[in-house]
Amino acid sequence: MGRLDGKVIVLSAAAQGIGKASAIAFAKEGAQVTATDINGEKLKELDGIPGIKTKVVDVTKKDQVDALAKDFDHVDVLFNIAGFVHHGSILDCEESDWDFTMNVNVRSMYLMIKAFLPKMLARKSGNIINMASVASSIKGVVNRCVYSTSKAAVIGLTKSVAADFLEQGIRCNCICPGTVDTPSLRERIQARPDPEQAFKDFMARQRTGRLCTAEEVAHLCVYLASDESTFVTGTEVIIDGGWRL
């Protein structure tokens, strides 16, 4: 018996990093997983894994999100992960940077929740997990202005949905990681003028002396997706190795 036997789970940004690790972990625990991403080539790496179906979806496009939702009679767990990290202070953030980041990090979750929530309400049962960050309303982080703002908005969205639909059988929580060793992080490091120094800077703020792994976050995701966490809602679940302390 798996911890997620029979649960229907839809997640975004599943082609790599936390999304990919979570999709695999969900399937291993018996869930029926639909893994979506905008990157069709990377998403193919999940093809053939028992319990996982893949679908290319741009979660910033309402028509694509609505079409995805129509494919399901019901969904037990919706996991919103899609996000973008902008580097810089408010002075480095152009209006286009602001709009792009808020569109990917916040509006996509709004679209996904709005599309799938009615199906959950019809069954008086549903579980929504949103990816936020310690870099948010939890902790001020240098050169993460619009990113932190967007993730603070995700925390607010999470609490609002949890409060509005608590009595109707809906749970909504968000995960707030610190620095996670993912392909996205490695790409951002390599894009910096001095990648070696950038990596040292990331490591210097890790009080545990190492980065979090995507698999460690996925273990937490399994717990939040399972019935083991039925009394948990409206919560920012932090997994940061003590970075915020």
From Swiss-Prot:
UniProt entry keywords in alphabetical sequence: Cytoplasm, Lipid metabolism, NAD, Oxidoreductase
What residues does NAD(+) bind to? 16-18, 37, 58, 151, 180-184
Question: Record's PROSITE patterns?
Answer: ADH_SHORT
* Cellular compartment(s): Cytoplasm
Enzyme Commission identifier(s): 1.1.1.-, 1.1.1.30, 1.1.1.104
The answer to whether the entry has keyword tRNA processing is: no
Record's keyword annotation contains Lipid metabolism: yes
Q: Which residues form a coiled coil?
A: none
Superkingdom is: Eukaryota
Any idea which GO molecular function terms this record carries? 3-hydroxybutyrate dehydrogenase activity; 4-oxoproline reductase activity; oxidoreductase activity, acting on the CH-CH group of donors, NAD or NADP as acceptor
Pathway(s) this gene product operates in, as recorded in its UniProt entry: Amino-acid metabolism; Siderophore biosynthesis
UniProt binding sites for substrate: 144, 188, 205
Which residues constitute the catalytic centre?
A: 147 (proton acceptor)
Cellular-component GO terms for this entry: cytoplasm
Looking up PANTHER family in the UniProt record yields: DEHYDROGENASE_REDUCTASE SDR FAMILY MEMBER 6, DIHYDROANTICAPSIN 7-DEHYDROGENASE
Relate the protein's function as given in its record: NAD(H)-dependent dehydrogenase/reductase with a preference for cyclic substrates. Catalyzes stereoselective conversion of 4-oxo-L-proline to cis-4-hydroxy-L-proline, likely a detoxification mechanism for ketoprolines. Mediates the formation of 2,5-dihydroxybenzoate (2,5-DHBA), a siderophore that chelates free cytoplasmic iron, thereby regulating iron transport and homeostasis while protecting cells against free radical-induced oxidative stress.
Query: What protein family does this chain belong to?
Result: Belongs to the short-chain dehydrogenases/reductases (SDR) family.
- How does this protein assemble? Homotetramer.
Q: What is this protein called?
A: Dehydrogenase/reductase SDR family member 6
Organism, as annotated: Danio rerio
Q: Lineage, please? A: Eukaryota, Metazoa, Chordata, Craniata, Vertebrata
